[in-house]
Amino acid sequence: MMIPPEGYRAKGYKVWTVGDDIAWMRKGPDGRLYAINPENGFFGVAPGTNMKSNPNALISTQKGAIFTNVARNLDDNTVWWESLDKNPPVNAEEWKGAKVNGPEYIAAGNKLAHPNSRFTAPTANCPCLSSEFENPQGVPVSAIVFGGRRPDTVPLVYQSRSWNNGVFIGSITGSETTAAAAGAVGVVRRDPMAMLPFCGYNMGDYFKHWIEMGEMLGDKAPKIFNVNWFRVDEDGHFIWPGFGDNLRVLEWILK
């Protein structure tokens, strides 16, 4: 759902969305790796989503969407969450169901929406949906990008030396925990390929499957990279601007 920076848009760059979460990948007739999106919607964290950070995601929620654990404006029956805008509803129902004065509630150190509140929106709502979304053959995969949330140590982007080295890089992924994970927030947790909560079998067997994929694809295997958008400076501010500017890194990866 990325929107290219202004300079890229002036050059004619466009970004089309096939999926934002799950990719099912298989070898195509030409020997390359292809991927489809098995889902028919988008599932995202609400807090922090706004018209500046992810306008296409927000536009996708305008109809037929499901919101969980967000706040509700009781005056007009609309939803609200932190960073949606700077105008929390005065007559609000916070995520646990209590009726509160939104600005006063926030000023007291509370959250109107749960930090891990979510939205689920139909794929058809996406203004940048790729024309290849319904293609049963999928789309060719040019690169595989792993990444974790690390405030230090890990650079913005680097490339693996080989497919197997890329599998190793994915296997040692670590990420600082957020409200989406159980337990303490802000602790670096080992999360191989960001799949720890989702892999239903032994991780060693999972890595073996990846290595076998590389053997099957041979010299047509996509290159593997690792990114870290979340490095911070000594004052705790993000060094990289993120969002649409991530296209600068993706351009380097693809070229």
Can you say where each PLM-predicted feature lies in the sequence?
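Catalytic or ion-translocation cores adjacent to nucleophile or general acid/base/metal-coordination motifs
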Residues: M1-D75
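Conserved NTP phosphate-binding and transfer environment spanning the P-loop NTPase/kinase superfamily
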Residues: P47-N50, P55-K255
